[in-house]
């Protein structure tokens, strides 16, 4: 049974008496009203908020990339996943990347140069993606060891990516294009507005000395190939010397898989032919069989 329903009548009587006293006091304070006037509610103060009026909800918080803050992180994660899928589909020759374990905004990578002035070069790098991607500036690409190149800062090792992407355009520019640009600079040298003026001048004035410094730079990068990563991360790219016990078997399996893929591709492409081997004439019955 509700205890409030069993309150003694005396307490109820006392409360009613108090209410009457308060009402009498209010009547004394309030101005006299004419009997002919209609009943009116007391005026509301200027700064008062009506109790019945609900407080308006706060404006929706927008994240830096224009999406709602509640699902902004999920949108960013989806965008980066889509970008990495595009990188895998492009199959950039000699370029390998791996997102960091600690942050999807940081990717580890390596470029293998197979011909040209920087032949045999193995250059490790890190891609830094802005936290408001894809609406912010273009990603940054920094080589672990500064490469002697007109477009690479000789101190920080950062590549001049903004040269190719002056304004990052959403849904038009992609991270795989940045990786392709980083690969292309080693095959097509550009000396306009360089980050390394010495490299640019040598390429224009003394190509032989430029080649000599490039060879030294390649040797320096390769000599540090087996060093520990500068950033401790489980997904960082690590190189180790060739170990026949570990690597021979893996190498054979990779080559066998590649050979089987080439054979299956060749069988699929060849198909059936109605052309006689060694000629351009279609198959036909032998003349002797026609005479008989």
UniProtKB/Swiss-Prot annotation:
- An example Pfam family from this entry, by short name, is UQ_con
Q: Which GO terms describe its biological process?
A: apoptotic process; early endosome to late endosome transport; endosome organization; endosome to lysosome transport; lysosome organization; protein transport
Q: Just give the chief location class.
A: cytoplasm
Question: What does UniProt give as GO cellular component?
Answer: FHF complex; plasma membrane
Residues that span the membrane, as ranges: none
- Residue ranges for the region (Disordered) are 1-44
CDD domains from the UniProt entry: UEV_AKTIP (cd23814)
For membrane topology, the record states:
Peripheral membrane protein
Q: Which cysteines are joined by disulfide bonds?
A: none
Its localization reads: Cytoplasm; Cell membrane
Question: What protein does this entry describe?
Answer: AKT-interacting protein homolog B
Species in which this protein is naturally found: Xenopus laevis (African clawed frog)
- Give the taxonomic lineage as stored in the record: Eukaryota, Metazoa, Chordata, Craniata, Vertebrata
